[in-house]
Regions:
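Glycine- (often His-adjacent) and acidic-residue-rich active-site loop
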Residues: 51-84, 97, 127
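Crotonase-fold acyl-CoA enzyme core
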Residues: 83-155
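A general structural signal for well-ordered alpha-helical segments in protein cores
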Residues: 8, 29, 75, 135, ...
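Conserved CoA-thioester-binding segment of acyl-CoA-metabolizing enzymes
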Residues: 1-52
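Short, small-residue-rich loop/turn micro-motifs
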Residues: 8, 51-53, 60, 115, ...
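Hydrophobic alpha-helical membrane-association signature
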Residues: 28-31, 71-74, 104
C-alpha cells in the first residue's frame, strides 16, 4: 500500500492506493507509522510523504474498515508518530487532501503544495463533529478565524 525509497538522507513514502485515491484504512495507517519509525531508526534526516496518481489522500476509505473498531486509534497513532518524529516530515501534496488526508498534511512539519491540490474537512457537511486534535492543529497553523471558516463552511 506504500512505496518507500531513499535518496541519501531523504526517505520518500508514496501512498499507493491509486484506485481508492490513496484513501486511508487501518493497514495503510500502520504502514505509514512503521515507515516513519524505520526512517528514524535508519538515521534518515528528512521524510517526504506523497500520493501516487492525481490525489494526495482522499481521506478515510469509507468502503473499507474505517467503521471497524481500532481504525480511529490507528489513525491517531499514525498522526502522533508523524508529529513526534525527530526528523522533519514534509507532505508533498500533489492533489486533493480530503478529511483524514488533510489531517495527514496537518501532522507534517511542512507542506509543499501543487497547483492542483486542495484541502477539505467535510465533517460538518456530513453532520460529524471534527475531533479536537484537528481543530487545535489547524488553528495553530492558520489562526483561529480562518480555521473556524474552514470548519463551518465544511471546506
Amino acid at each position: 500500500m506504500i512505496g518507500i525509497s531513499r535518496d541519501g538522507d531523504v526517505v520518500t513514502v508514496e501512498l499507493q492506493r491509486e484506485e481508492r485515491r490513496n484513501a486511508l484504512n487501518t493497514q495503510l495507517c500502520v504502514e505509514i507509522r512503521e515507515a516513519v519509525d524505520k526512517a528514524v531508526a535508519d538515521d534518515a534526516r528528512v521524510m517526504v510523504i506523497t500520493g501516487r496518481g492525481s490525489s494526495f489522500c482522499a481521506g478515510a476509505d469509507l468502503s473499507g474498515d474505517v467503521y471497524a473498531e481500532g481504525f480511529t486509534d490507528s489513525l491517531a497513532e499514525m498522526l502522533r508518530t508523524i508529529v513526534e518524529a525527530p526528523i522533519p516530515v514534509i507532505a508533498a501534496v500533489n492533489g486533493p487532501a480530503i478529511g483524514a488526508g488533510t489531517q495527514l498534511t496537518l501532522a507534517s512539519d511542512l507542506r509543499v503544495v501543487a497547483p492542483t491540490a486542495r484541502f477539505s474537512v467535510p465533517a460538518a457537511r456530513l453532520g460529524i463533529s471534527v475531533d479536537r486534535w484537528t481543530v487545535r492543529r489547524l488553528a495553530s497553523l492558520i489562526g483561529g478565524g480562518p480555521a473556524r471558516a474552514v470548519f463551518l463552511a465544511a471546506e
